[in-house]
């Protein structure tokens, strides 16, 4: 396993304090292939990103530094927290999901 730096242009440019981070939001990509998922997360026009992407081989791509908000949680809430991008680290695992037949992970 290795960590690869490949930064996405999609994040909130305002820095946040580590104390603001309260959650980890774990998703699967839901894309047909790993390449398509990576391309989308790096595409400025997609307006989506994550802090970390776990590839099929176990390598990790760091896409957004933790002190910035990635755009992964959309309209979201948990208890008193709203817009979870503000308070979370987003981790994606490459998996086609229910739209393209789940793969074991």
Task: Give each language-model segment a name.
Residues 2-105:
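Active-site-adjacent loop/helix surface patches within enzyme catalytic domains
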